[in-house]
Amino acid sequence: MTILNNLPSIFVPLVGLVFPAIAMASLSLHVQKNKIF
């Protein structure tokens, strides 16, 4: 049960770092593809 109790403390920073990184990467690729600045 200790692993299940530690999951939120692992997922919160992981999601908080990975999701914005993916969003920024997809946004930059979208801007480069459309040549809109």
Swiss-Prot record:
Role this protein plays: May help in the organization of the PsaL subunit.
Membrane-topology annotation of the record: Single-pass membrane protein
Species assigned in the record: Populus alba
Pfam families: PSI_8
UniProt-listed GO biological process terms: photosynthesis
InterPro entries in the record: PSI_PsaI, PSI_PsaI_sf
A GO CC term assigned to this protein in UniProt: chloroplast thylakoid membrane
Subcellular location: Plastid, Chloroplast thylakoid membrane
Protein's name in the database: Photosystem I reaction center subunit VIII
Gene: psaI
Transmembrane segment boundaries: 7-27
Keywords linked to the UniProt accession: Chloroplast, Membrane, Photosynthesis, Photosystem I, Plastid, Thylakoid, Transmembrane, Transmembrane helix
Family according to the record: Belongs to the PsaI family.
